[in-house]
């Protein structure tokens, strides 16, 4: 799915910007939090704390959306989400995060949210 991004779109998702992660709360409201994320192939990843609300929401609903905005430029990635808890999977997510942002602090409760991107929306010039 991410083959729909142009080189300009790929450049945008490698720049150092924060984004928002949106998930569905138990009461049906939208839970939106700031996150750092990475995109590799058709998978967006967010590293986070295992007991966080966003993890609970993904476990319950399995859907998520990431939105990144910088001035008038924007990109939204939507898809199905799962929680990665395996040591190698989480280490890979941390490695990707460190390459885009910085090395995160050690967190023994860390997990990763993996979103298989099924829909991409964004600024003109970002999507093929």
Where does each model-flagged region fall?
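A generic structural signal for short, non-catalytic loop/turn and secondary-structure boundary residues
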Residues: 14, 59, 68-70, 106-108
């Amino acid at each position: 799915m991410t083959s729909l991004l142009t080189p300009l779109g790929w450049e945008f998702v490698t720049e150092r910007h924060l984004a928002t992660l949106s998930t569905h709360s138990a009461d049906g409201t939208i839970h939106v939090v700031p996150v750092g994320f990475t995109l590799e192939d058709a998978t967006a990843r967010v590293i986070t704390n295992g007991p966080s609300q966003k993890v609970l929401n993904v476990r319950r609903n399995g859907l998520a959306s990431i939105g990144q905005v910088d001035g008038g430029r924007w990109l939204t990635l939507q898809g199905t989400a799962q929680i990665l808890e395996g040591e190698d999977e989480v280490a890979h997510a941390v490695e990707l995060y460190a390459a885009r942002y910085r090395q995160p602090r050690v967190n023994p409760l860390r997990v990763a949210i993996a979103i298989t991107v099924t829909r991409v929306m964004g600024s003109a010039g970002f999507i093929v």
